[in-house]
Amino acid sequence: MKVINSSRKVQIPENVTVDVKGRSVKVTGPRGTLSKSFDHASVDINLVGKKELTVDLWFGNRKQIACIKTITSIIENMITGVTKGYEYKMRFVYAHFPINVAVTDGGRVVEIRNFFGEKIVRRIELLDGITCYRNEKAKDEIVLTGNSLELLSQSCATIQLRSAIKYKDVRKFLDGIYVSERNVLESN
């Protein structure tokens, strides 16, 4: 059964400006600018004044209607990113060989050494807009921060996958770098 019209609204805060061109959304706030294209979805994205954004779908089935909630959630995450920002904390887990992690190039590159006793250096370049630093308060922890939740999550997933032990039982060999905490940064 098709629903004639399905709509969701996103409230825009005072210090954020949103520009909509077709199905592309650009969000600007105190921490920077994020943009995203929703060309793959057949929805109408419109600004209602300066305080509200609506996402409409006409004659959609269940999967298309579910896409509306996804799009509004992504836009809300973009608004949170440009106003407050996001932070992920990752912990090192090892049984015998201590993992050495160095953050280089101004927080843009993570180098993993002595992983499972290996002599090679695993080098991971972070995505644009993501910075990393070692947490001085906690042992064996790095902190990644950024405005885009998607890019930050992808950078953490890349670090976790690059530090995974292949061809071994993951229940027994737990060594690696894992996300331990996810936070929204408080506005300064």
UniProtKB/Swiss-Prot annotation:
One Pfam family linked to the record: Ribosomal_L6
InterPro entries per UniProt: Ribosomal_uL6-like, Ribosomal_uL6-like_a/b-dom_sf, Ribosomal_uL6_a/b-dom, Ribosomal_uL6_CS2
Record's keyword terms, sorted: Ribonucleoprotein, Ribosomal protein
GO CC entries: cytosolic large ribosomal subunit; extracellular matrix; phagocytic vesicle
Keyword Glycosyltransferase found: no
Protein name as annotated: Large ribosomal subunit protein uL6
Any one Gene Ontology molecular-function term assigned to this protein's record: structural constituent of ribosome
Species name: Dictyostelium discoideum
PROSITE patterns membership: RIBOSOMAL_L6_2
A GO BP entry: cytoplasmic translation
Family the entry assigns: Belongs to the universal ribosomal protein uL6 family.
